[in-house]
Amino acid sequence: MDSWFILVLFGSGLIHVSANNATTVSPSLGTTRLIKTSTTELAKEENKTSNSTSSVISLSVAPTFSPNLTLEPTYVTTVNSSHSDNGTRRAASTESGGTTISPNGSWLIENQFTDAITEPWEGNSSTAATTPETFPPADETPIIAVMVALSSLLVIVFIIIVLYMLRFKKYKQAGSHSNSFRLSNGRTEDVEPQSVPLLARSPSTNRKYPPLPVDKLEEEINRRMADDNKLFREEFNALPACPIQATCEAASKEENKEKNRYVNILPFLSLAVSKDAVKALNKTTPLLERRFIGKSNSRGCLSDDHSRVHLTPVEGVPDSDYINASFINGYQEKNKFIAAQGPKEETVNDFWRMIWEQNTATIVMVTNLKERKECKCAQYWPDQGCWTYGNVRVSVEDVTVLVDYTVRKFCIQQVGDVTNRKPQRLITQFHFTSWPDFGVPFTPIGMLKFLKKVKACNPQYAGAIVVHCSAGVGRTGTFVVIDAMLDMMHSERKVDVYGFVSRIRAQRCQMVQTDMQYVFIYQALLEHYLYGDTELEVTSLETHLQKIYNKIPGTSNNGLEEEFKKLTSIKIQNDKMRTGNLPANMKKNRVLQIIPYEFNRVIIPVKRGEENTDYVNASFIDGYRQKDSYIASQGPLLHTIEDFWRMIWEWKSCSIVMLTELEERGQEKCAQYWPSDGLVSYGDITVELKKEEECESYTVRDLLVTNTRENKSRQIRQFHFHGWPEVGIPSDGKGMINIIAAVQKQQQQSGNHPITVHCSAGAGRTGTFCALSTVLERVKAEGILDVFQTVKSLRLQRPHMVQTLEQYEFCYKVVQEYIDAFSDYANFK
């Protein structure tokens, strides 16, 4: 840049000197003037009234560049003539000295005429290339000065063009003669690759984001989340979108374009990176991982690293080695993952070929097949039985559906050559189903459970774990980074999210695609740091209970009290209770501290002609196997009974669990919303008592509910638990275990619609029932329990669920009673 500045400065000086010389001579017939004019208008014309006809000859000199960059001036004489009886066209009025500058910057030599008029021309204005006319001699000093300045200018232009061509050639060589393009942070946009390679963009800021010690994690996250995540957005935007020059020659071939789901999410054929970028990466890369990245050669290429996954070519099929997938390093493990796009219909066979060739045992899927009615991933497995994809046969062995994810076990085998048939392999697919269509999960609890399951089930000597979403960068990158940073947290007691994301973006661009995903990573790490792994094998529950009853050194609390203290420290999000806090709805709330959150409140149809009639104090609650398993509701008030039954009808709830008496300690806890005999109507809903049966600790009532407007009826069963005392908790867990079993049996017969659970306020006893039902179902299915995280999840869905320390302790005791009482206990050991 300095040399360019000197050249331009030198040229400007010469022009200035020449201009000054030119102004010292009065214009005459032979004087040549240096001006700057438009290339489309070589001489300005001015109409003046005259009885004679005139012609103006303008001699222009403009540099013409030949292909070999030889500069030669071409002389063009512009002749403007106009023949008229009463008018002439004269030369533009002359100016004494100075330089006239036109917008396009082309320099011309124009002959000036003071009073001379040439011979008239026949016809209209025309332009012809001629040789310059000879004019009477005059002082040639200014002409020489102008020509010197012009020659100097042409030399400068020539030098600039040569320098530009040399620099362009250098960049072209650095691109390895392939299509290269860069991607920006944020959402995927379908843009065509550039034909000219661009240098990798440096981070947009020089600000450093060093690794964080885990004991500073909470403080730093709170600081960066202030002002609507301002500092987190700055940190995310500082990430290099692609810290290397992406060479995607194979992905850009015509034969492979249809294999890519998004045109700007492509795997790298090889990695080319500047020396500065290599140094920056090495500063933030652990020593073990640095060995995997490799050394840069003299051109700044990482010659020993190829992140694109190569398939074994199929004979006779061009470019059959291509699949949109990239190797990604783990924390200290080379190529731990393969980040892939979600298979398309035409690439499913290639996907299974990759699974077989890479000896993969675990597939992680972080998208649903369709989101917002848009196909995100082709279903690459059969629903049941077996199916053959190319030369790989896939059969479904087992499917387990849980609230946050589904686990599928496949048996795969290569087909074709019977004599050389390979043995069968077991593949486990972990399909995370709780990622919302927009944004990120509202809590990282489900993702951490999911990740732990993946880590535990992946065989030690298996190939790379294949992770895919739709594009294979956003959610995929989020999963990979959380996995790596948890490993780093355990190994070094610190995390380096910024550094690790920067490094894996050198293997696949746009890994971790949005600032929301970036913040979610930090939230997951903080969740793990604050609460740890609280899952227990059922065989270790008794030992755990003995441990948590012991006092914690340095405190007055035991372990159980400390656990519950952590739960009560979870902030209640009062700003997310808008509808329940509306003046028209306040009278519908029994307890003002327990109002449903906006994101999961139960909505009922608006009554025609009446505003604010879609509200009821009730929340959807997730269970063990499915979302919205429960409706946690307050006990109806006298004026909200109709809303309660409208909710039951709208959401097809066939089971109601009541955990309070109508009156306790002289106070009304719940309005009676069913008839003692016969039938009663609440608006369009009619309720008829068909049967009532007393059990050991609860009453079962069979109710026929009819919607008179729709002229339809349903059978509803109410389980009214009497074993909860007015003060404290039940003396044992037997009654609770029995009613949970009865409700689950009813659900199997009536369909898995939400179970409506209520006490008085719909939090303490209601939360305890939901927690126990969820925990016991998992104990039966997996032999694992996690009371702490179950209650924590409930409290994130509705305020004050499991309201007291006694209720929290009761959850542990009931689970222990269940394990001790049932013969299935032998299976847990």
Swiss-Prot record:
Catalytic activity: O-phospho-L-tyrosyl-[protein] + H2O = L-tyrosyl-[protein] + phosphate
Region described as Disordered: 79-106
Extracellular side: 20-142
Phosphoserine PTM positions: 202, 204
One annotated GO biological process: regulation of focal adhesion assembly
Signal peptide start and end residues: 1-19
Cytoplasmic side: 167-829
Entry's localization field: Cell membrane; Cell junction, Focal adhesion
Gene Ontology molecular functions: protein tyrosine phosphatase activity
Highest taxon, organism lineage: Eukaryota
Catalytic residue positions: 469 (phosphocysteine intermediate), 759 (phosphocysteine intermediate)
Sequence ranges assigned to domain Tyrosine-protein phosphatase in this UniProt record: 232-528, 560-818
Modified residues (Phosphotyrosine): 825
Annotated PANTHER family: RECEPTOR-TYPE TYROSINE-PROTEIN PHOSPHATASE (PTHR19134), RECEPTOR-TYPE TYROSINE-PROTEIN PHOSPHATASE ALPHA (PTHR19134:SF433)
Subunit structure: Part of a complex comprised of PTPRA, BCAR1, BCAR3 (via SH2 domain), and SRC. Within the complex, interacts (when phosphorylated on Tyr-825) with BCAR3 (via SH2 domain). Interacts with GRB2.
Descriptive protein name: Receptor-type tyrosine-protein phosphatase alpha
Organism taxonomic ancestry: Eukaryota, Metazoa, Chordata, Craniata, Vertebrata
